[in-house]
Amino acid sequence: MMKQDWVKAAAALALAALGIGAAHADATLDRVKQRGKIVVGVDGASPPFGLLDPATGKVGGFQTELGADIARRLGVTLETVPVTASTRVQFLQAGKVDLLIANIQWTQERSEILSYAPTPYNLVGGAAMVSKKSGIKRWEDLKGKVACVSQGSNFAKPLQDTYGAVVKGLRNIPESLLALKGGSCDASVHIQPALYETLNGPNGREWSDFELATPDQLIPSPTVIWTRRNEADTRAFVDGVIRDWHQSGLLVKQAERYGVPADYLKQASIQAQAGKFESAPPEALATP
């Protein structure tokens, strides 16, 4: 599913993306090269994007693989830091992480406080997980119902403004799902792949009384890699890497390996091989 109505960013954004000299590198690239390590914020144990290894306590999976490829290209090691909806922006702004490779879709508000590589590495929208007995079959059926989301979710506004839901913000997806199971939410609204994994993954049997209300995703949006403001070299370098991921098929390969839905990525790869790339809207002016 390709989102054709995005504003196309200028092709010059990716020029020199794969060859940045240390003398011209911005603060992030300088710091990464000096310490020999890049620190990437990822979603943590959030299947199918992040998987926790109980033996080591470390997070692996789709997002970690992408971070590892960036580290390899820079000739440094990778450190991942689990982030949540309530900590990820602060971690990036405070320098606790160098990049965010998490399920953070482009929004106007986010683009006013952070920078990002304009080429998306995925396209993701929201889904509503509900009880099979709820009678909720469309987004419109959420009017007057309690919809649980993660704090800071970009799904909150359309749920409230477009569909009239009563939005309840919780710390993360597990808390939201527990609230749904406990009856304090009528729907748990999060990115579609994560809820699909919940229903169909290894622990799916405990959710046999629940389902996705509709196959229609809520505001499918470009998922981008986020950087700090005014770090043009980092932004350009990462954008060039993402374009190479699309052209080489790496994103499709890793998505299929970890069970991430790959329909959009397959189409994007075909387009990339023809030299065509999707782009998130141009970066907004920084807020005062």
List where the protein language model places each region:
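Periplasmic-binding protein-like
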Residues: 122-130, 202-242, 261-285
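Bacterial N-terminal signal peptides that target proteins for export
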Residues: 1-11
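Extended ligand-binding regions for polar small-molecule ligands
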Residues: 64-73, 133-136, 140, 146, ...
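A ligand-binding cleft/hinge motif common to bilobed small-molecule-binding domains
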Residues: 87-90, 104-112, 158-161, 186-219
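Short helix-initiation/N-cap motifs at beta->coil->alpha
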Residues: 64, 79-90, 134, 152-154, ...
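Acidic, polar ligand-binding/catalytic clefts
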Residues: 68, 72, 77-141, 212, ...
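Extracytoplasmic small-molecule ligand-binding "clamshell" domains
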Residues: 25-103
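Ligand-binding cleft/hinge of the Venus flytrap
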Residues: 50-54, 67-76, 152-172, 199-206
